[in-house]
Amino acid sequence: MKISTLPQEFMQAQPILEHIESAGFEAYFVGGAVRDMLLNKPIHDVDIATSAFPEEIKALFTKTVDTGIQHGTVMVLDHGDGYEITTFRTESTYTDFRRPDKVTFVRSLAEDLKRRDFTINAIAMTKDGDIIDLFDGLTDMAQKRIRAVGDAEVRFNEDALRIMRALRFSAQLGFDIAPHTKAALKQIGRNLEKIAVERIRVEFEKLLMGQYASNSLSVAIEADLIRYLPGHIKKEDWLTITADLKRNQPQARTVIWPYFLSRLSLRLNELQLFMRSWKTSREDMRAVLSIVPIVKHVQTVSVFELYAIYDYQALLFEVLTLIGTPLATQQRVKQIFDALPITHNRDMCISGGDLLANNIVTPGPQMGRILTQLEHAVIQRIISNRPDSLLEYAKELVDNEKN
């Protein structure tokens, strides 16, 4: 098979391959960029594999960076965008179930391709567009199938993260997982516990955003893989999430965790511990702690609660849509947001300095307490947000405290 017209992303990198070949080495486009081109999907990073060893690549080009030289990868910056060039290699045992104990550089493309995870990722292409498919990846693409290269159990034992990658590709592409590969998922699933949580989380987030996430999660439930994920989530919760994802999927990564935790049978005081078990970012933690309590009782949410999460309202509505909250309820929440007289405490027309300047309070806890009461009074429309009204009301509050 030959691609007659190469996408621009590959044409821009052709001079790199030509230069390597002119020195007597082999060079090919490999990996996800080739796969995505064949699937008519957007192409991201273009990777190159070569028979030249790292030091030979560095001698051929003037601008290089050792991005992963111990594994044979050198970044070449000679032609515009940087391109990662990796030497053909074979790999030894994987004691940590993630990285090979030893990498051996070789001159054979076939040896390099057979160490890869799935057949759809083990396709190479020459600079002129000739496709090299040694493991029937094209057939698997045509039949919409995720199949491991060689023995699936061996592949998953080498790198247990490939279990999550199989599920993720299935969720993104809508491909079925081949029977032998699916059986290996269940057999080797326990090795997920040996993988860094951060790496699992990245794949899991991509999975949930996939158009076919529901089908992929169903496979994970059937293979009993969910028991090896952080947080010990109940099967009933997984089934609820699977049903949600048949209708809609998160369109942005920021929605994932507020949505996900809104569907779990967790008490509010357990949210933070759960998020820590997944090693999420502080921003994700803040979003969850702000949004999930609202979602849990959205029918009775107060104006104060919505005011407190004003900056998260777009995220809140995305979560409410994902879980199928009635439109009437969402409209009521939006009306409360829209009717807020202020959206942040910085919108208040007076500050603590004004209270001090007018000799209404003295520095200390009382000032903060009065400012909070003023803020609440404005939100409830007891008073208007005007300096004269606020100062007058502040005097009343102080007098009431004295009495």
UniProtKB/Swiss-Prot annotation:
It is an enzyme of class 2 (transferase). Its cofactor is Mg(2+). CDD domains: NT_ClassII-CCAase. Keywords: ATP-binding, Magnesium, Metal-binding, Nucleotide-binding, Nucleotidyltransferase, RNA repair, RNA-binding, Transferase, tRNA processing. One of its GO terms (molecular function) is CCA tRNA nucleotidyltransferase activity. InterPro entries: Bact_CCA-adding_enz_type3_sf, CCA-adding_enz_C, CCA-adding_enz_firmicutes, NT_sf, PolA_pol_head_dom, PolyA_RNA-bd. The keyword Nucleotide-binding applies. ATP binds at residues 32, 35, 116, 159, 162, 165, 168. Signal peptide: none annotated. Its EC number is 2.7.7.72. It catalyses: a tRNA precursor + 2 CTP + ATP = a tRNA with a 3' CCA end + 3 diphosphate; a tRNA with a 3' CCA end + 2 CTP + ATP = a tRNA with a 3' CCACCA end + 3 diphosphate. GO terms for biological process: RNA repair; tRNA 3'-terminal CCA addition. It comes from the Bacteria. Catalyzes the addition and repair of the essential 3'-terminal CCA sequence in tRNAs without using a nucleic acid template. Adds these three nucleotides in the order of C, C, and A to the tRNA nucleotide-73, using CTP and ATP as substrates and producing inorganic pyrophosphate. tRNA 3'-terminal CCA addition is required both for tRNA processing and repair. Also involved in tRNA surveillance by mediating tandem CCA addition to generate a CCACCA at the 3' terminus of unstable tRNAs. While stable tRNAs receive only 3'-terminal CCA, unstable tRNAs are marked with CCACCA and rapidly degraded. A single active site specifically recognizes both ATP and CTP and is responsible for their addition. Belongs to the tRNA nucleotidyltransferase/poly(A) polymerase family. Bacterial CCA-adding enzyme type 3 subfamily. This is CCA-adding enzyme. It comes from Leuconostoc citreum (strain KM20).
